[in-house]
């Protein structure tokens, strides 16, 4: 990842070692400034990133607030902020990605590169939005609000700190818990995870095995990982956002928030890019087809199946009781991981999920649909109904001779539901 472009280094004392390392990594130009001039430097330079070189609090709280506001409200591509910190201290700016000052400078550069990859992706999305608007005369519906609202953090642990960690994390993030590394691995494959906390209760060998799984999968290259206890140093190069932390839950949450927000923002950008590349066919919130596109695709599939005498089945997944917005989104995103390549689906207006199985008869569709419903039931989170079991029901219909799009939809919306096991 290229680091070219102006970057501001904020420090009241010379930060020669860090500046030299940045220069060697390809950062140019580097603008050094003191805290008193940081706001003016940000406005004048319009940097690609801001680096807080000195650990500890900002010397002036008002300056820190103003600089934070300037960075957060800057138009165009995001400006990552990375701050050196001591131990489990919080960063000088609340929006800054923390980097332990006691670690080698190479670790700092790796975290900077990770953040700059997100900035580059954001720039690509903004360009595609402009192109989309020029050619189509409209903008697709794009997600808004804090990306942290989309985030899910996985806590793996079974020691005495696990309950406190769960409470602290649950107050700030959507959270998944795992009492074993095997369960944690299942969650990673089934859900969109934006941060991982490896808690106490695991042997060093188990922790190393789990981190090895993360390091070998490019999907988890930039995911924030907080390891309570000693983190093996071998993973620093492949996992730039791995940290060793102590067991204080509140400090851990404060350290994780900026990193998790950045990762969730990256995931949002990837969904938006998919939407733009397909001219608005996919919903950037769920990753499934939009409702209108699903209707068009199903209409074509019905006509094609009728002409070629091939099978076509349709499933509707509904849930007992009202779903909150987060649970509805989680179930839809989970479906994107379970759907077969030749099938397609969407989220309906009431939160139910529609899934079309092409070239699949009723018997085969029944097997696949029940498996999907069972996985949704097991993995979906409903924070407002934490004590209730989520019952996912499946309604199935298959194409018959003389069927049309409307008749098939009427049957799947009104036929008898089969409760998922």
Residues covered by each model-derived region:
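Conserved nucleotide-binding and Mg2+-coordinating catalytic segments in signaling enzymes
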Residues: 276-296, 317
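Non-catalytic signal-transmission and effector/linker regions of two-component phosphorelay proteins
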Residues: 1-28, 43-44, 72, 110-152, ...
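Conserved helix-loop-beta segment at the catalytic/binding core of cyclic-nucleotide signaling proteins
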Residues: 281, 332-365, 374, 378-383
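Conserved phosphotransfer microenvironments
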Residues: 34-39, 48-76, 85-87, 194-221, ...
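Receiver (REC) domain switch/output surface
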Residues: 104-136, 238, 248-268, 272, ...
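Catalytic-core segments of nucleotide cyclases and related cyclic-nucleotide turnover enzymes
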Residues: 362-370, 397-421
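Alpha4 helix (beta4-alpha4-beta5 surface) of REC/receiver domains from two-component response regulators
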Residues: 20, 58-72, 79-106, 208-209, ...
């Amino acid at each position: 990842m290229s680091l070219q472009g102006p970057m501001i280094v904020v420090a009241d004392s010379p930060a020669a070692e860090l500046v030299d390392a940045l220069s060697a990594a390809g950062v140019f130009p580097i603008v050094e400034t003191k805290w008193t001039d940081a706001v003016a430097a940000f406005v004048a330079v319009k940097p690609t990133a801001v680096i807080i070189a000195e650990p500890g609090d900002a010397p002036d709280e008002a300056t820190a607030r103003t600089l934070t506001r300037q960075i957060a409200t800057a138009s165009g591509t995001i400006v990552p902020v990375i701050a050196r910190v001591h131990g489990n201290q919080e960063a000088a700016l609340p929006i800054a990605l923390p980097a332990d000052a006691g670690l080698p400078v190479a670790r700092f550069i790796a975290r900077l590169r990770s953040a700059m990859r997100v900035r580059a992706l954001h720039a690509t999305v903004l360009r595609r939005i402009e192109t989309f608007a020029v050619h189509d005369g409209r903008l697709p519906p794009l997600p808004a609000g804090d990306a942290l609202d989309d985030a899910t953090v996985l806590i793996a642990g079974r020691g005495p700190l696990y309950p406190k960690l769960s409470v602290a994390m649950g107050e700030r993030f959507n959270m998944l818990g795992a009492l074993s590394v095997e369960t944690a691995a299942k969650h990673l494959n089934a859900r969109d995870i934006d941060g991982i906390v490896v808690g106490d209760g695991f042997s060093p060998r188990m922790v190393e095995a789990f981190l090895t799984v993360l390091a070998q999968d490019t999907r988890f290259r930039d995911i924030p990982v907080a390891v309570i206890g000693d983190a093996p140093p071998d993973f620093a190069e492949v996992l730039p956002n791995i940290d060793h932390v102590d067991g204080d839950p509140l400090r851990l949450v404060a350290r994780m928030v900026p990193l998790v927000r950045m990762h969730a923002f990256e995931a949002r950008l990837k969904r938006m890019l998919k939407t733009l590349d397909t001219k608005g066919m996919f919903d950037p919130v769920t990753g499934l087809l939009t409702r209108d596109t699903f209707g068009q695709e199903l209409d074509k599939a019905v006509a094609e199946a009728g002409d070629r005498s091939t099978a076509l089945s349709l499933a509707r997944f509904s849930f007992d009781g009202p779903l909150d917005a987060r649970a509805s989104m989680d179930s839809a995103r989970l479906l994107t991981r379970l759907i077969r390549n030749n099938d397609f689906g969407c989220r309906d207006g009431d939160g139910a999920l529609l899934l079309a199985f092409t070239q699949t008869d009723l018997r085969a569709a029944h097997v696949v649909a029940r498996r999907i419903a069972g996985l949704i039931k097991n993995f979906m989170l409903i924070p407002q109904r934490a004590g209730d079991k989520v019952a996912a029901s499946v309604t199935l219909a298959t194409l018959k001779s003389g069927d049309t799009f409307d008749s098939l939809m009427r049957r799947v919306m009104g036929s008898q539901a089969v409760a998922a096991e």
